[in-house]
UniProtKB/Swiss-Prot annotation:
The keyword Cell inner membrane appears for this protein: no
Binding residues annotated for CoA, in chain numbering: 193-196, 313, 529
The organism's taxonomic lineage, starting at the top: Bacteria, Pseudomonadati, Campylobacterota, Epsilonproteobacteria, Campylobacterales
One Pfam entry name: AMP-binding
Recorded GO CC terms: cytosol
Organism of derivation: Wolinella succinogenes (strain ATCC 29543 / DSM 1740 / CCUG 13145 / JCM 31913 / LMG 7466 / NCTC 11488 / FDC 602W)
Catalyzed reactions: acetate + ATP + CoA = acetyl-CoA + AMP + diphosphate
Listed name of the protein: Acetyl-coenzyme A synthetase
Annotated positions binding Mg(2+): 545, 548
Keyword set, alphabetical order: Acetylation, ATP-binding, Ligase, Magnesium, Metal-binding, Nucleotide-binding
Protein family according to the UniProt entry: Belongs to the ATP-dependent AMP-binding enzyme family.
EC number: 6.2.1.1
InterPro entries referenced in this protein's UniProt entry, alphabetically: Ac_CoA_lig, ACAS_N, AMP-bd_C, AMP-bd_C_sf, AMP-binding_CS, AMP-dep_synth/lig_dom, ANL_N_sf
Length: 654
């Protein structure tokens, strides 16, 4: 899939713009200049307006230990109270969460009901599982409301939650439990996917087998699909049997603005996943502010983000952001094509969804598999469409804009990351003329620049490093337990005025208007269906197969997923030159990847090769392999390779 970008601009819908929070580019420019002229004043004003402080902050920003920035120093708050307690006077009977299961079961949970459910859950964690402020709790759950209950309950009592995507393997789950030194695992028996039950509890059992996670004291299980599970007496407890016995009185714990709120593990360019640490005040401020600015959600709107709570998009734009601003957020358990490709459009019609936020992968899939399906449904309540996780190609953009949005809904093509906490570059739906496939302009207060390593701006049309040159409140605070890796991962590539700045890992191009187009990763991370996978992590998994001598993994462009995994594999003696065995090897190696990481990381293509292109110092030249995988001309200098002839040999096999 080649990424070509239109130069045509789509102006905001005038009727929409009249009632938008930011109505035109002049208002955007005023906010941008406010941040430029009085940086701390800009953020301090937002924090005072939007957060219900238990104690006021004394200092907006402390840069004394940069890049370990501290925001809203001295302030105290509770994120759960920000999401629930403060809405009870005016919104107690408003729907907070609308849940639909894949089999069609549904629940509407009001703010009052959610408030009481979360307080009971918080008491259960405190009283029965001895979870205290600062303890880590791993949540390995499907897309059901109880996942949100658990996150908010942790926030209420000051525990640090770490949600692990339910598609990850036992090994991946174990690694995250060990790194976080978690006290408790919360899971479900299972859930439903593609109309069938799938299991989560056995994965937890495997992760904890043979005392592999000594920090874990107990396992709390939510019963969802009622399939038979293994029950370990003294360790395993059923949430559904215990929650009704708990009191609904649980005052929120006052938390320092810089206390950790959650950890979320993300792939890095080295093998070990990074525990991205987000803290209290800055995170919730930007989650709420971007909900208001980017989606322009109004009091009576229904908002739906199709992500999973196991990813940052689910944290910020299913749970924390919508609830902090008092919105109605939709949660859906299953896949977009069950029982057919009209499932999402049927839900948009039924729940009268006004803002819809999804990944380009899903749009491409539905465009390919059910192009005419949207015509069967009334989608006229939609006001804003959004995309997240990867760049969107113009064909998919045009179908989304015309067929789903009826040519009336602005598309907010949002660029941000696990590490940024919330949107960084995005159109504002009432203000920004939209360019298909382009993230457009940095949000007010965000100083995103396309520069070289020394901080010099790249000329218009020329690719450079996408860097954020000033701190922002929702930024990553640390990599859990590894401050050196935090500095080396994010602040060692680029400088501005001699000072290290945050490098996002992405390349970008800025045009004459100042619009920013993301060109893709500049490090060894693959973006599959909007999910980041580290090449080193996949390579480590493949290397565990006894027949593999050496491997290198790169990305290949994919029409549906954006990128797919392409593995070049050197086999050990005795495994080569046997076609029948090679087919079996392909299955076995993907089984290893699934076991070690999860099915998302499986290689779509494997090529058995006699060797890999290496420099004389032993470094594998992945850019050459990426060019081969994508069928591109090799422009890199191969004369410095240890064996220049290996490139031609690999090309012939590919």
């Amino acid at each position: 899939m080649t990424q070509t970008h239109s130069t045509e601009l789509f102006k905001p819908n005038r009727a929409f713009a009249k009632t938008a929070r930011i109505k035109n580019l002049c208002e955007y420019e005023d906010l941008r200049l406010d941040a430029e002229e009085d940086f701390e004043g800009f953020w301090g004003k937002l924090a005072k307006e939007k957060i219900d402080w238990m104690e006021p902050f004394s200092k907006v920003l402390d840069e004394s230990e940069a890049p370990f920035y501290k925001w809203f120093v001295g302030g105290k708050l509770n994120v759960c109270a920000q999401c629930l307690d403060r809405h009870l006077d005016t919104r107690k009977n408003k729907a907070a969460i609308i849940f639909e299961g894949e089999l069609g079961d549904s629940r509407i949970i009001t703010y009052r009901e959610l408030f009481y459910e979360v307080k009971r859950t918080a008491n259960l964690l405190k009283n029965k599982f001895n979870v205290k402020k600062g303890d880590r709790v791993v949540i390995y759950m499907p897309m059901i409301p109880e996942a949100a209950f658990m996150m908010l309950a942790c926030a209420r009592i000051g525990a640090i939650h770490s949600v692990v995507f339910g598609g990850f393997s036992a090994e991946a789950l174990r690694d995250r439990i060990i790194d976080a030194e978690a006290k408790l695992v919360i899971t479900a028996d299972g859930a439903y996917r593609r109309g069938k039950p799938y299991m989560l509890k056995p994965v937890v059992d495997d992760a904890l087998a043979e005392g592999a996670c000594p920090s874990i004291e107990k396992v709390l299980i939510v019963i969802r699909n009622k399939e038979e599970i293994n029950y370990v007496p003294g360790r395993d407890y059923i949430y559904n049997e215990m929650i009704g016995l708990e009191s609904a009185h649980c005052p929120p714990e006052p938390m320092d603005a810089e206390d950790p709120l959650f950890l979320l593990y993300t792939s890095g360019s080295t093998g070990k996943p990074k525990g991205v640490q987000h803290n209290q005040a800055g995170y919730i401020l930007w989650a709420q502010t971007t909900m208001e600015w980017v989606f322009d959600v109004k009091e009576n709107d229904t908002y739906w983000c199709t992500a999973d709570v196991g990813w940052i998009t689910g944290h910020t734009y299913i749970v924390y952001g919508p609830l902090a601003m008092g919105a109605t957020t939709v949660m859906y358990e299953g896949v977009p094509i069950y029982p057919d490709t009209g499932r999402w459009w049927k839900m948009i019609e039924h729940y009268r969804v006004n803002q819809f936020y999804t990944a380009p992968t899903a749009i491409r899939l539905l465009h390919k598999e059910g192009k005419e399906e949207p015509k069967k449904y009334n989608l006229s309540n939609l006001k804003v469409l959004g995309t997240v996780g990867e760049p969107i190609n113009p064909d998919a953009w045009n179908w989304y804009y015309n067929e789903i949005g009826g040519g009336q809904c602005p598309i907010v093509d949002t660029w941000w990351q696990t590490e940024t906490g919330g949107h960084m570059i995005s159109p504002l739906p009432g203000a920004t003329p939209i360019k298909p496939g382009c993230a457009t302009l940095p949000l007010p207060g965000i100083f995103a620049e396309v520069i070289d390593e020394e901080g010099n701006p790249k000329p218009a049309g020329e690719q450079g490093y996408l860097c954020i040159t000033k701190p922002w409140p929702s930024m990553i605070r640390n990599i859990w337990g590894d401050p050196k890796r935090y500095e080396s991962s994010y602040f060692s590539t680029c400088k501005k005025n001699g000072k290290p700045v945050y490098f996002a890992g992405d390349g970008a191009i800025r045009d004459e208007r100042g619009y920013i187009t993301i060109t893709g990763r500049m490090d060894d991370v693959i973006n599959v269906s909007g999910h980041r996978l580290g090449t080193a992590e996949i390579e480590s998994a493949i290397a565990k197969h006894p027949g593999v001598a050496e491997t290198a993994v790169v990305s290949r462009l994919d029409e549906i997923k954006g990128e797919s995994v392409y593995a070049f594999i050197v086999l050990k003696p005795g495994y080569e030159d046997n076609v029948a065995e090679e087919l079996q090897l392909l299955k076995e190696i993907n089984a290893v990847i699934t076991r070690e990481i999860g099915p998302l990381a499986k290689a779509d293509t494997m090529l058995f090769v006699p060797g890999l292109p290496k420099t004389r110092s032993g470094k594998i030249m992945r850019r050459i392999l990426r060019s081969i995988a994508r069928g591109e001309e090799i422009t890199q200098d191969t004369s410095t390779l240890e064996d220049p002839a290996i490139v031609q040999k690999i090309q012939q096999l590919a």
